Amino acid sequence: MSDDATFEKFRACTVEVLQVPEDKVVLEARFGDDLDADSLDLVELVMALEESFDITVEETELEDVTTIGQAFDLISSKL
C-alpha cells in the first residue's frame, strides 16, 4: 500500500472515530488543540486503527504522540 493510500485509510478511520471533518485531519493537526480529542477518544482511535491495519500499538508508544503526523508515522512504522 502506498503512503498516500495508507494515509487515506488512516484519515477515514480518524474521521469516523473522532467525528471531525476530513479537511481537519492533516499531518500538523494536534489531537487536543485542533481536533478536540481527549484521551478516551485517542484510545478509541488507536483501537480502530489497530483493527483497520491489523497491527498492535503498545500504550507506551503513544506517550509522545500529539499530532496526526506522529500517529501516522507510528502506524506506518508497523506496516
Locate predicted features.
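Phosphopantetheine-attachment site and its flanking helix in carrier
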Residues: 33-51, 70
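Thiotemplate assembly-line natural product biosynthesis machinery
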Residues: 1-23, 76-79
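Residues in well-ordered alpha-helical elements
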Residues: 8, 23, 43, 66-69
